[in-house]
């Protein structure tokens, strides 16, 4: 798998193109650099009109034969024109007790319900222990209606199961772009989708990793490493009609192995907004910009 990560056998990432981002990434520059985190996908591409899917994130891995303690967690909404189920109890309890699913807007319900059914199918004594509050799972969304037949309800139970099962075999290298829930997404008038990165906390043995499903932003505001790329592109394009006026959404899931409590994770989730702003996001009124942060460090049996 290490050889497959080399340029030529995978799509180049921003750092491969010498874009000078700050900080030191982890080994895989992905949310999976936080120990135990696993990610899976189900990608649905059919004909000319179906471009959608499901992304799964397991905070403590996919081995349900052992007890998995909940993770301390919290969340923040920069702009709330979106959906993330299960967050009322997460807020009150401070616990994340299920995997996280990300999909398209009209498929939140099937994802939420199918996750519960998936756990019931695997309902031996240990996985039932891991079902503490999994009846209120986390399922989030962004709208893929520009590239996908969003009202065709193409995500089915088997696709949710596939995303959950795929996390067992996908390994630490996380696919990006046109994959999983990100399949039909676009940002800043470019094709977008699923993205991930990580950073090592300076002078401390901690890692912060994120996974995003990006579907937001206007091209004229796109900023990369401090450079107003969007404005430059609009000046040189012959057809600079801007399709996206800023509507859209972004879901950000942040994982860390730093020992943080729920009120501290609230502060971390809130500060994701600053990163969105540096990229050119403005939290427009039609946008659903919702962020969840969790820590894998603290072990607590409830």
Predicted segments, located by residue:
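Alpha/propeptide regions of enzymes that mature by internal proteolysis
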Residues: 1-302
């Amino acid at each position: 798998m290490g050889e497959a990560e080399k340029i030529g056998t995978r799509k180049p990432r921003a750092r491969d193109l010498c874009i000078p981002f700050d900080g030191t990434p982890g080994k895989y520059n992905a949310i999976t650099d936080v120990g135990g985190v696993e990610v899976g996908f189900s990608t649905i591409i059919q004909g000319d009109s179906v471009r959608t899917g499901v992304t799964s994130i397991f905070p403590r891995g996919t081995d349900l034969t052992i007890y998995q303690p909940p993770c301390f967690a919290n969340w923040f909404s920069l702009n709330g024109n979106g959906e993330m189920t299960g967050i009322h109890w997460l807020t009150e309890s401070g616990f994340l007790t299920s995997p996280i699913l990300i999909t398209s807007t009209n498929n939140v319900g099937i994802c939420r319900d199918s996750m519960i059914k998936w756990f019931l199918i695997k309902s031996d004594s240990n996985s039932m222990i891991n079902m503490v509050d999994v009846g209120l799972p986390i399922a989030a969304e962004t709208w893929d209606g520009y590239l996908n037949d969003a009202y065709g309800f193409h995500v089915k139970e088997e696709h949710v199961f596939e995303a959950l099962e795929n996390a067992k075999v996908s390994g630490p290298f996380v696919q990006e772009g046109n994959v999983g829930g990100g399949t039909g997404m676009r940002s800043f008038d470019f094709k977008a989708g699923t993205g991930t990165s990580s950073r090592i906390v300076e002078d401390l043995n901690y890692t912060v990793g994120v996974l995003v499903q990006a579907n937001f932003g206007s091209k004229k505001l796109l900023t990369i490493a401090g450079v107003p790329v969007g404005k430059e592109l609009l000046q040189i394009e012959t057809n600079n009609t801007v399709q996206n006026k800023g509507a859209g959404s972004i879901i950000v899931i942040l994982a860390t192995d730093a020992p943080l409590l729920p009120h501290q994770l609230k502060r971390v989730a809130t500060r994701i907004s600053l990163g969105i702003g540096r990229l050119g996001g403005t939290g427009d009124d039609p946008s659903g910009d919702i962020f969840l942060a969790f820590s894998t460090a603290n072990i607590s049996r409830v």
